[in-house]
Amino acid sequence: MMFPIRCFSCGNVIAEVFEEYKERILKGENPKDVLDDLGIKKYCCRRMFISYRIGEDGREIIDEIIAHDERYL
């Protein structure tokens, strides 16, 4: 699944800050502090970031799905 453009619950646009969130998380910053700095205050929006899987190498789950599909074509 790709990162959603909007929060599933409230509809706020959240994708505009995802790349910065991802970069800072990969640098080792605390997700709580990053979300606070980015202005993501609502818990429904915060859970969209926290629950989205980003591997230690920066790969997202969609990258793994695509690689899996290509092996079996």
UniProtKB/Swiss-Prot annotation:
What PROSITE patterns is this protein classified in? RNA_POL_N_8KD (PS01112)
Among the record's GO biological process terms, what is one?
Answer: DNA-templated transcription
SUPFAM superfamilies associated with the record: RNA polymerase subunit RPB10
The residues listed in the UniProt record as binding Zn(2+), with positions renumbered to this chain, are C7, C10, C44, C45
Keywords (A to Z) from UniProt:
Cytoplasm, DNA-directed RNA polymerase, Metal-binding, Nucleotidyltransferase, Transcription, Transferase, Zinc
The EC number(s) this enzyme carries: 2.7.7.6
For this record, the Gene Ontology CC terms, alphabetical, are: cytoplasm; DNA-directed RNA polymerase complex
Subunit and partners: Part of the RNA polymerase complex. Forms an Rpo3-Rpo10-Rpo11-Rpo12 complex upon coexpression.
Query: What does it do?
Result: DNA-dependent RNA polymerase (RNAP) catalyzes the transcription of DNA into RNA using the four ribonucleoside triphosphates as substrates.
Can you say what this protein is called?
DNA-directed RNA polymerase subunit Rpo10
